[in-house]
Amino acid sequence: MFHHSSKLQYPVRVDKPDPEFAMLLQQAIGGVEGEIRVAMQYFFQAMGARGDARIKDLLISTATEELAHIEMLGYAVALNLEGAPLSYQEASAQDPVVNAILGGMNPRHILSSGLSAMPVNANGVPFDMSHIYASGNVAADMLANVTAEATGRVLATRLYNFTEDKGMKDFLSFLIARDTMHQQQWLAVIEEMGGIGASLPIPNSFPPEGEANEHSYYCLNTSLDKPLPEGRWSQGPSYDGRGQFTAKQEPELLGSEPLLGNARPGSGAQQEQISGVPPEQPV
């Protein structure tokens, strides 16, 4: 179950409402980098968490914190929409050009939500849960979580740089700080599991004899006009300690040409596809 406080996790203040910034803040709510995504991702990972119960507890706790971030962002959107034009006449009175674009705001903030936040991104597209990653493998999920927090922090810093509002900058600095913690929090879980080397390859429970190990540790170049760039990925021991990284400058073609043969009768193909015989050409 969940408990709720009437107070926000952190103060949210807007010194000068900005409907355009309200539209941009929607990305932090309903975008693929946003808080709905991470809240639901951590929640469903927790629902399928097996093994160390501490990890499930951590996931649930962080999912709940992300819900608190949605609450704060929703309040920030509403505050930025204060005083937004509600009619053709009101918009035109402010600026004749604003009539066409409503000051850059999302018109659905008027038409659909009455000047409040929605579960959509900055383009007004609803969040559809297609970017929720909960694999049941804790190592894979933690790496996905680091990526989610990293892209979320990138978004928050871009929003911070976009606005000149001191209240919004203060609020966003808090979200940036929490993303800093959450990135490292999920990496710390991997460390608790023995570190990245012990976790790789994911899943580390698959028997090595089931893998074509001769193909496991070379970095493959597919460029026709450039050699493979050299780096840690092309030399030295693999992170799992099971092999050595090498470079292969061109693919070794071990397969044959993929020919499917003739089409099946009744499949809707042309007669020539079924028979494999080209039609006679008229003389």
Regions found by a protein language model. Give the residues of each.
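Non-heme di-metal
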Residues: M1-V283
